[in-house]
Amino acid sequence: MSGQVERSYLEIKSINELIEKNKPFNDLYLEKVNPPDFQLNKFFYKEIGKKHRWIDRLTWSDRNWSDYLNSSNVKTYVLKENEDLIGFFEQIFYNDKLECEIAYFGILEEYIGKKFGGYLLSEAIKKSFNFGSKRVWVHTCSLDHKHALKNYLSRGMKIYSTETAKVKSA
């Protein structure tokens, strides 16, 4: 049995287009994961992704995770309140094109609905441009959180492509 998924590709081409969402609480801070910690990325990927059918990395070995995250063009940031983990984003920089892909982005379930998503996405976009990108892009789909697309659009990103894909039912 299979179904269909709507996938949207979004971009923002200037930091001036960003509609920034301010930090909802003063105790929040963003931390670059350095050195890379594949266990942390793996944790976020599995915890956030389990409700949204993130499956492409489920078969990755620890070596796959480590190799990917130790690439010089991959960066991970974690949002924390005090020492509690809230969410994360992964960036892949394509230096030859001066582009950055926000490859993965998400908030842990217990923090959804508390206004962290808009702030975290604002920070992801700003960090992407701070590294010299001329274009930041992301893709989302109808399996992602119901407010994911709205968040991207609310931050000033524009849809540049859509597609429908067939997926096997869970």
Model region roles, listed by residue range:
Residues 75, 134, 158:
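Short acidic/polar active-site loop segments enriched in Thr and Asp
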Residues 1-29, 34:
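Acyl-donor-binding surface of acyltransferase catalytic domains
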Residues 151-162:
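Conserved acetyl-CoA-binding loop of GNAT-fold acetyltransferases
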Residues 128-140:
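Conserved GNAT acetyl-CoA-binding A-motif
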Residues 111, 115-123:
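Conserved acetyl-CoA pyrophosphate-binding loop and the N-cap/start of the following alpha-helix
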Residues 112, 138-148, 165-170:
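Conserved beta-strand-loop-alpha-helix junction that forms the acyl-donor binding cleft
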Residues 58-60, 69-76, 80-99, 103-107:
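A conserved beta-strand-loop-helix scaffold within acyl/acetyltransferase catalytic domains
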